[in-house]
Amino acid sequence: MNTQKLPMRKGVGVIVLNKNNHVFVGKRKDNPGDKWQMPQGGVDKGENFVEAMKRELYEETSIKSIKIIKELEKNYEYELPKNLVGIIWKGRFRGQKQKWFIAKFLGQDSEINLETKNPEFIEWKWIEPQKLPDVIVDFK
């Protein structure tokens, strides 16, 4: 399979900051290692980036109480490792091209609930921004 012929998935991600400017990260249900990520996902047909970001954030964390601080100008993209192409996203994409946002969490931690309709995270925490490179999935 020539993976370069596969398109990039259109996606969004959000850096959620709490009152201490720590970043929300979730431990993925489908990743056995000690790797974490920020809420992110695909853009559905007919959605704009802001709508997709808010939907993904709610679907993954139940968080609604946010204020968007910034929409990053640059899009970021990543390619899946070869062993995951054909498995993730039913083999339709080779990676993701994402629009990222920074948002301030205005609620209480009790608002966060990972037991959603289709849970993606099994655990969550707030971390200092400088620790992100040490904990996030390496190809993202």
Feature roles, as predicted:
Residues 44-138:
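Unchanged
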Residues 37-38:
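A short gly/proline-enriched turn/hairpin at secondary-structure junctions
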Residues 31-34:
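A conserved beta-turn-beta hairpin within the catalytic core of GNAT-like acetyltransferases
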Residues 2-23, 45:
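Conserved N-terminal beta-strand and adjoining loop/helix that marks the start
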